[in-house]
């Protein structure tokens, strides 16, 4: 319904079941997108995490980026748009691995901010967040290298970074790019919306020879713990 030319999806899943969407169901609904690539990412045994791209333009190639992760990953596509070839990197970076119990601890801290409860809860959460951040750092380095090495001048990087705009992850990936939301969004841009963890962790970044406008965190779809983010992109 969005009319977008390119859709980038993380944690993509289809099941041959009457209760779930099958791949045929998805292709029927997305018949306006004649080109698609679906890649399984992560090195863990029995993993089912997939990243997908549906496009109205030809996808010339897709390649999973080489960095360590049991469940997460990034995929680089070359997409032909008119006379130009665009490098597009679709990301689902390392998750923070907070359990339901951890999220309850966080909610309790907010509801009843007693000194000892906050101290012990903060210590637990900081340790877990730091562990995930340390894993994301080399992932961000790999993506930054791919951006620098791209043979094509037009570059778009998007997806779930699982980290905030002031993080090493975001700074490293975005160092030579423009942030579409910073450039043309409104408000805080909160994209993760569960358990009172209200953060902007989903992004669209573009090379500086492109211009993003009307970047929007769309709250229309409520079923996910992430809101979708979209924007228009033109040549500068």
Labelled PLM ranges:
Residues 103-129:
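A solvent-exposed, charged loop/short amphipathic helix patch at secondary-structure junctions
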Residues 39-42, 83-84, 96, 117-124, ...:
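Short C-terminal domain-edge/linker segments immediately following a structured domain
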Residues 1-2:
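N-terminal signal-anchor transmembrane helix
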Residues 78, 137-156, 161-236:
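Metal-dependent phosphoester-hydrolase catalytic domains
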Residues 21, 25-28, 49, 124, ...:
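Extracytoplasmic/secreted proteins, especially bacterial periplasmic and envelope-associated proteins
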Residues 11, 126-133, 158:
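Second-shell loop/turn segments in exported
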Residues 6-106, 220:
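Structured beta-strand-rich core segments of catalytic domains in phosphoester-bond hydrolases
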Residues 69, 131-142:
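Soluble or luminal CAZymes and related metallo-dependent hydrolases
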